[in-house]
Each structure stands twice: as structure tokens, then as C-alpha cells.
């Protein structure tokens, strides 16, 4: 068994591999570390690029495009390691990025997963949308980060350099104990893409495991390389999967009241898009809710299993406020300004 497996999931990312794999190889020379590219049945020359240009990288060929969640699930079945790092193909890592995370997990057995600080690749002084300096969630399922609240991204001035527990760690650069990943069922493949890492992290936190952000490790993320922001497909997946995540994980006494408020908030979001003349994204919200109700029963067994294994009903990193109220109504656009 190796110590750390850095696993990059790829789909038609030939250009991204050429651009970012060199930094991963050069900066991941920690003893016991191996690098893998798991290819989701790309139709471009991705596999040939890995084999010919990066012979030190292990290539895992998947037979079809399984999406983010099952793509990683199937790839990780083929890897024997203590730690796995789920790393997006559009991430530039920095020298020594692995060491602080490995050291932390080695010395903190209560912690099962962590993420580095995520900065924006194109605006390198800013935090990056997908993970910034650690993820949190509000009462109604809205995710936010130290360094990012809705679309407002902060400049990194060292204000969030403390190692702290988080509710979720970004799937763009997620280090996790592989045995625990398997024990809790891994990523939910039915999500396909979006929200699946938050769902996984909720399962981990409710079982009493700790997740942290390690800001002394820094990477740079392009973001939006698969589905662009404001893409109706992305809107659909985000809204549908967020509802599924709530259904799977909310304590029984919270399920109905939270879902009632979410109905109101979701339709408010759709109305905002209509007022902007963006009818395709408004329709995506409607379709997401309709799809949620159509397939909800398929997740009932998962909900019962999650509740049966819950040891933390109240998770400190799941804040009791409404992020919509705090950010959209009160205008609080930074993590430190939110009323915790």
C-alpha cells in the first residue's frame, strides 16, 4: 500500500493535462506518493498524452463517462493507498503542497479529510469560488466558504490562514483517508456532478469525523472547466442535488420546516432569473425541483442509513442563519461579516 495517491479525474481534458500535470508531477515528490489520471472515456487524445508525455503517471481507463462522483468511485477501487487526493485537472499545485496535509492527518486521527487553500488561477490574489479557505453551510443548505459568499470572492490577505474545522472540503482538491471514504459509501454516483463532495462531507461530519482546511498548503484552480457558471445544466444539477443532499442528511425534526423554506427560496431564485430575462435558468430550477420529487424515494434507504449512523445532530459548522438573508438582504458579503 502506498501512502498518498493523487488522483486526477479527466474527461476530454487533453489541454488541461498538458498545462497542469507538469506542476503536479514536479511538486508532488513526497515519499510514498503516486499520481494517477482516471480517464472518463475521453474522445480526445487525453490517454495518449498521459502515456507518451507523462510516463511516470498511472493511467486508469474507465469504460464510459461516469461523471465526477462515480468516476472517482470506480477509479479509487483500483488504488491501494492510505490517503487519496481528489484533484481537479485544472488545478496548479505549488511546491510542498502535500506535506502539510499529510502531516496533519498523520498527527490528528480524529480528522479524516482536509483541503488546501484554493486561490483563483487567473486572479491569483483572490480566493477561488469552489473552495476558498474551507466550506460551510447554512440551515437551508446554501454552501459558502471562508473567502467566498455567493458570488462575492475576497482577496486573500492572510485573514483566513488559521487551521479550523470545516463542514465541507472542496472536491477540487480533497485529501481523504481512503478506508473511511469507502466505509461511508464514497461519493453518491446518482448526483453525477455538483454537491456530491458536500453530501459526502455531511455524512462524515454527522458520524463525528473532523474535516479541516490547511491554508499553509496552497493551490490555484481555474474553475468552471467542465460546466460554465450560469449554465442551465449546472443550475439544474446544483438545485436538484442540493435538495437530495438535504433529504438524505437532515435530522427528522428539521426536514419539513427546512424544505418548506427551501421551496420559497428556490422559487425566489427562479423569479430573479425571469426578471433578468434568463428563462432557461429559471426553467432549470423548476425542472430540478420536479426531478427531486420524482426520484426522492430512491434515496429513502440512504436517508435511513445516514440517520442511523448519526452521532452529531447539531454540527457546529452548519450555521443556523439564512445565508440568503445575511448576504442578499443585509448585504454581508464576506465570511467574517456573517452573523455566526
Give the predicted meaning of each segment.
Residues 161-218:
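A short, conserved alpha-helix in the catalytic core of glycosyltransferases
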Residues 84:
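Short aromatic/hydrophobic "clamp" motif used to bind/position activated sugar donors
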Residues 32-41, 60-62:
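Short beta-strand/loop segment that forms part of the nucleotide-sugar
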Residues 22-32:
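Short, acidic, metal-binding catalytic loop of nucleotide-sugar glycosyltransferases
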Residues 92-142:
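Conserved donor NDP-sugar-binding/catalytic core segment of glycosyltransferases
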Residues 62-79, 89-91, 100:
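Glycine-rich, basic loop-to-helix element that forms the pyrophosphate-binding segment
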Residues 4-7, 207-304, 309-319, 323-324:
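Active-site-adjacent helix/loop segment of glycosyltransferases
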Amino acid at each position: 500500500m502506498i501512502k498518498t495517491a493523487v488522483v486526477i479525474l479527466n474527461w476530454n481534458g487533453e489541454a488541461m493535462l498538458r498545462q497542469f500535470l507538469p506542476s503536479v508531477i514536479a511538486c508532488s515528490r513526497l515519499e510514498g506518493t503516486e499520481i494517477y489520471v482516471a480517464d472518463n472515456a475521453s474522445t480526445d487524445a487525453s490517454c495518449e498524452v498521459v502515456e507518451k508525455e507523462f510516463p511516470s503517471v498511472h493511467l486508469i481507463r474507465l469504460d464510459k463517462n461516469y461523471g465526477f462522483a462515480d468516476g472517482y468511485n470506480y477509479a479509487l477501487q483500483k488504488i491501494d493507498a492510505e490517503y487519496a487526493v481528489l484533484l481537479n485537472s485544472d488545478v496548479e499545485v505549488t511546491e510542498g503542497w502535500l506535506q502539510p496535509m499529510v502531516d496533519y492527518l498523520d498527527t490528528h486521527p480524529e480528522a479524516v479529510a482536509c483541503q488546501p487553500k484554493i486561490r483563483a488561477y487567473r486572479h491569483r490574489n483572490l480566493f477561488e469560488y469552489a473552495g476558498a479557505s474551507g466550506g460551510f453551510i447554512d440551515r437551508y443548505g446554501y454552501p459558502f466558504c471562508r473567502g467566498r459568499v455567493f458570488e462575492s470572492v475576497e482577496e486573500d490577505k492572510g485573514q483566513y490562514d488559521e487551521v479550523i474545522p470545516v463542514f465541507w472540503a472542496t472536491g477540487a482538491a480533497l485529501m481523504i483517508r481512503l478506508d473511511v471514504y469507502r466505509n461511508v459509501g464514497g461519493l453518491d454516483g446518482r448526483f453525477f456532478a455538483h454537491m456530491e463532495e458536500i453530501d459526502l462531507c455531511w455524512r462524515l461530519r454527522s458520524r463525528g469525523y473532523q474535516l479541516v482546511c490547511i491554508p499553509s498548503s496552497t493551490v490555484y484552480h481555474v474553475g468552471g472547466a467542465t460546466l460554465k457558471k450560469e449554465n442551465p445544466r449546472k443550475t439544474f444539477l446544483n438545485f436538484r442535488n442540493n435538495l437530495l443532499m438535504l433529504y438524505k442528511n437532515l435530522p427528522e425534526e428539521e426536514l419539513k420546516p427546512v424544505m418548506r423554506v427551501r421551496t420559497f427560496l428556490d422559487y425566489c431564485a427562479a423569479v430573479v432569473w425571469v426578471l433578468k430575462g434568463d428563462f432557461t435558468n429559471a426553467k432549470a430550477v423548476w425542472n430540478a425541483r420536479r426531478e427531486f420529487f420524482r426520484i426522492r424515494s430512491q434515496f429513502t434507504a440512504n436517508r435511513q442509513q445516514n440517520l442511523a449512523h448519526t452521532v452529531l445532530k447539531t454540527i457546529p459548522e452548519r450555521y443556523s442563519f439564512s445565508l440568503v438573508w445575511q448576504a442578499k438582504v443585509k448585504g454581508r458579503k464576506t465570511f467574517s461579516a456573517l452573523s455566526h
